[in-house]
């Protein structure tokens, strides 16, 4: 009977009689959840509208805290918990990865990920669960930045995970405290009561240490606090955080014989503390450096993609140099302008990434270099 099936999927928490939680290992729940994720992807598996998907959703706040596997006691841990926990995480991350093929996927990292508790010492299997999610195509995020409690905050274990995966997958930050309602002044960091800017500074400092690619300012009063109490930190992240890519040296000829191949060179730096995650499976190295020959109307008449120039490797402001030989330049004789860009190879090699340069750009997004005469 359908009603009996629904009851099998749910259990009721004693303290919150109106709250229900599924048993995520229940095959009936999984069957219907798979339909839900498939329908969700039909709407949101589109990078034009979706930046990323939090692809776990189990436990408190969907962050993998206090995940229940026992319908009679939601906090129960037995000899099967670790096995079931891993099987569920593997199932749900593969499920999202199957349907979200174009949009990055994200999971929270913390010391009791997927466990029937929300605090305590690090579970010995949590590190391997994070690695499993990443192997299934995930990025990582923490929603406890600025919380320094060793039992439930962003502490030594979480910092070690961030360091382990630095420049391999992007990390997303969200602050743990809601400064308008949480007693943040009890934090071990010594935040002063009535000084939310202390919390913002703590979150920012941990974000810089973790080399986060994105700072999530949450919503409502939290966002207002970032702008009203710590706007200088917002400005710093805009200029320092994530990736900041630019070519600091480009060598192109000013004379080209029609039909000839041309050698060009470029040197790139990433001045941000994060990295450009071109290696994400959903992106699959689709962003590449390209050169263009632009006509008098600012239209790219020829585009040459340097497939060996890989932006995901550019980190820590180090210079990365490349030399590239173009295919034959088969354009009519005349004056053109060299352009350079990072293009999306899945969208007809159109410029896709804003470069951190002040040079003039075409409407299409090509950074203009200098004129070239084709003879």
Predicted regions and their residues:
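An active-site-proximal structural segment forming one wall of the substrate-binding cleft
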Residues: 18-54, 86-95, 99
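Single conserved hydrophobic/aromatic residue that forms the stacking wall/gate
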Residues: 1-14
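Structured domain cores in non-transmembrane regions
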Residues: 19, 23, 34, 68-70, ...
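Catalytic cores of secreted or luminal carbohydrate-active enzymes
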Residues: 199-252
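Glycine-rich, aromatic-flanked loop segments that form ligand/cofactor-binding clefts
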Residues: 6-9, 52-57
């Amino acid at each position: 009977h359908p009603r009996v099936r629904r009851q099998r999927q749910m259990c009721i928490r004693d303290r919150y009689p109106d709250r229900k939680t599924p048993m995520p290992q229940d095959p009936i729940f999984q069957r219907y959840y798979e339909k839900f994720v498939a329908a969700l992807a039909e709407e949101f598996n589109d990078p034009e509208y979706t930046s990323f998907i939090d692809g776990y959703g189990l436990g408190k706040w969907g962050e993998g805290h206090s995940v229940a596997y026992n319908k009679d006691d939601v906090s129960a841990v037995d000899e099967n918990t670790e096995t079931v926990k891993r099987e569920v995480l593997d199932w749900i991350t593969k499920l999202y990865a199957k349907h979200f093929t174009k949009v990055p996927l994200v999971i929270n990292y913390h010391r009791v990920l997927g466990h029937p508790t929300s605090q305590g010492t690090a579970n010995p299997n949590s590190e391997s669960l994070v690695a499993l999610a990443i192997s299934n195509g995930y990025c990582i995020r923490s929603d406890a930045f600025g919380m320094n409690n060793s039992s439930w905050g962003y502490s030594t274990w979480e910092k070690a995970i961030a360091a382990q995966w630095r420049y391999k997958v992007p990390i997303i930050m969200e602050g743990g405290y809601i400064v308008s309602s949480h007693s943040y002044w009890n934090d071990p960091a010594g935040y002063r009561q009535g000084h939310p800017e202390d919390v913002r500074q703590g979150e920012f400092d941990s974000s810089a240490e973790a080399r986060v690619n994105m700072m999530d300012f949450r919503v409502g009063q939290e966002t207002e606090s970032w702008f009203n109490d710590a706007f200088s930190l917002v400005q710093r992240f805009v200029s320092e955080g994530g990736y900041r890519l630019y070519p600091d040296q480009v060598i192109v000829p000013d004379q080209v014989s029609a039909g000839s191949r041309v050698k060009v060179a470029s040197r790139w730096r990433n001045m941000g503390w994060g990295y450009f995650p071109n290696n994400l499976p959903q992106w699959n190295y689709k962003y590449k450096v390209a050169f263009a020959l632009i006509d008098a109307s600012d239209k790219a008449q020829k585009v040459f993609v340097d497939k060996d120039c890989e932006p995901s490797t550019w980190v820590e402001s180090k210079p990365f140099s490349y030399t590239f030989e173009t295919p034959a330049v088969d354009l009519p004789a005349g004056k053109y302008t060299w352009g350079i860009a990072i293009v999306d190879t899945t969208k007809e090699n159109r410029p896709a990434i804003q470069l951190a340069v002040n040079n003039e750009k075409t409407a299409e997004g090509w950074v203009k270099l200098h004129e070239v005469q084709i003879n």
